[in-house]
Amino acid sequence: MEIIPAIDLLQGSCVRLHQGDYDQVTRFSDDPLAQAQQWVKQGATRLHLVDLDGARSGQPINDQAVRLIAKELSIPVQLGGGVRSLERAEELLSCGLDRVILGTVAIENPELVMELASRHPHKIVVGIDARNGFVATRGWVEESEVEATALAQRLSKAGIAAIISTDIATDGTLAGPNLEALRAMAQASEVPVIASGGVGCMADLLSLLALEPLGVEGVIVGRALYDGRVDLHEAIQAIAEGRLQDPLSDQSRTIA
């Protein structure tokens, strides 16, 4: 299972939102490239970028930072947030990104997902962000009537590389991933699933190993890394060794 550090970009800075709320912002760094290089130094094999400005408004405010990171890093970089057209997706891929993540457009224009997946094999990922089992769009500001698992089942047949499953209720809370929702997503999907949201300690990461046989092949970690609750290098080693344990019996689940 791959541990993927996240850098969320808002007006050029590295931030985290609490449960997707743009009014609850924690800023961690004003130098996204330096932060990205730090994760590489600690052993990251892939980097996950989120353009929060793009997700909310569709404006490419963070493109300078994105292009610099894609150019300078020696590992694959993927980006989501505001990718809602064929032109935008191809522009990002041409600047050196390994993958682009489609969110809102996957509901509003599923034909575009299929076209991009056909034109760019292994480069297109769908991000399914869910609140109470239903997909949220446009930077989590709007909610749809589409069930997350139904969307996963449908789009996983479109030739995409993977699905990123984000549980909004746990994102940025450090309260632990929603294992039940992830299990349902993995069972519905025909492509690998990457978990996102809620990881607060090493035990949370290890608990995800139980879902690996179902197709959960990666996990995106944000706030727990920035808060120092998870050491990236140690986590990568632990996952590689497959140290599966019962998270309920692990003292490290306490986040207070």
Curated annotation (Swiss-Prot):
Family per record: Belongs to the HisA/HisF family.
Residues that span the membrane, as ranges: none
EC number: 5.3.1.16
Catalyses which reaction(s): 1-(5-phospho-beta-D-ribosyl)-5-[(5-phospho-beta-D-ribosylamino)methylideneamino]imidazole-4-carboxamide = 5-[(5-phospho-1-deoxy-D-ribulos-1-ylimino)methylamino]-1-(5-phospho-beta-D-ribosyl)imidazole-4-carboxamide
Pathway: Amino-acid biosynthesis; L-histidine biosynthesis; L-histidine from 5-phospho-alpha-D-ribose 1-diphosphate: step 4/9
Recorded GO MF terms: 1-(5-phosphoribosyl)-5-[(5-phosphoribosylamino)methylideneamino]imidazole-4-carboxamide isomerase activity
Source superkingdom: Bacteria
Record's keyword terms, sorted: Amino-acid biosynthesis, Cytoplasm, Histidine biosynthesis, Isomerase
GO annotation, biological process: L-histidine biosynthetic process; L-tryptophan biosynthetic process
A UniProt-annotated Pfam family: His_biosynth
Any Gene Ontology CC annotation: cytoplasm
Active site annotation, chain numbering: 8 (proton acceptor), 129 (proton donor)
Organism: Synechococcus sp. (strain CC9311)
Protein name as catalogued: 1-(5-phosphoribosyl)-5-[(5-phosphoribosylamino)methylideneamino] imidazole-4-carboxamide isomerase
Entries under InterPro entries matching the protein: Aldolase_TIM, His_biosynth, HisA_bact_arch, Isoase_HisA-like, Isoase_HisA-like_bact, RibuloseP-bd_barrel
